């Protein structure tokens, strides 16, 4: 499956990743290779292969709640794309 440079740039923008021109070409090739391999995996015959076991198949698996100290606003807001003092700034979505 082919992916365009514009697709990679759009994905980087959505993920808020800074990608320069030299990286776009490399990422475009890498993502295309990954998507091509996914197409190959779709064709694999898995009839007769038992389902995986373990945590992935667990239903209603709960753990006990444990109170842990908060890391504080400096840590939690460190990667926020936009902030105002100790608050996240998000786009307005209501009229």
Swiss-Prot record:
It is an enzyme of class 6 (ligase). Keywords: ATP-binding, Ligase, Nucleotide-binding, Protein biosynthesis. Its EC number is 6.3.5.-. GO terms for biological process: regulation of translational fidelity; translation. It comes from the Bacteria. GO terms for molecular function: asparaginyl-tRNA synthase (glutamine-hydrolyzing) activity; ATP binding; glutaminyl-tRNA synthase (glutamine-hydrolyzing) activity. Coiled coil: none annotated. It catalyses: L-glutamyl-tRNA(Gln) + L-glutamine + ATP + H2O = L-glutaminyl-tRNA(Gln) + L-glutamate + ADP + phosphate + H(+); L-aspartyl-tRNA(Asn) + L-glutamine + ATP + H2O = L-asparaginyl-tRNA(Asn) + L-glutamate + ADP + phosphate + 2 H(+). InterPro entries: Asp/Glu-ADT_sf_sub_c, GatC. Heterotrimer of A, B and C subunits. Belongs to the GatC family. HAMAP family: GatC (MF_00122). Allows the formation of correctly charged Asn-tRNA(Asn) or Gln-tRNA(Gln) through the transamidation of misacylated Asp-tRNA(Asn) or Glu-tRNA(Gln) in organisms which lack either or both of asparaginyl-tRNA or glutaminyl-tRNA synthetases. The reaction takes place in the presence of glutamine and ATP through an activated phospho-Asp-tRNA(Asn) or phospho-Glu-tRNA(Gln). This is Aspartyl/glutamyl-tRNA(Asn/Gln) amidotransferase subunit C. It comes from Desulforapulum autotrophicum (strain ATCC 43914 / DSM 3382 / VKM B-1955 / HRM2) (Desulfobacterium autotrophicum). The lineage of its organism: Bacteria, Pseudomonadati, Thermodesulfobacteriota, Desulfobacteria, Desulfobacterales. The gene is gatC.
């Amino acid at each position: 499956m082919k992916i365009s440079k514009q697709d990679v740039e759009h994905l980087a923008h959505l993920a808020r990743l800074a990608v320069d021109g030299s990286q776009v070409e490399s990422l475009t090739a890498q993502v295309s290779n990954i998507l091509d391999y996914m197409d190959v995996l779709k064709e694999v015959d898995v009839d007769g292969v038992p389902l995986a076991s373990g945590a992935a198949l667990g239903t209603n698996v709960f753990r006990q709640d444990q109170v842990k100290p908060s890391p504080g606003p400096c840590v939690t807001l460190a990667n926020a794309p936009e902030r105002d003092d100790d608050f996240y700034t998000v786009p307005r979505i209501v009229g």
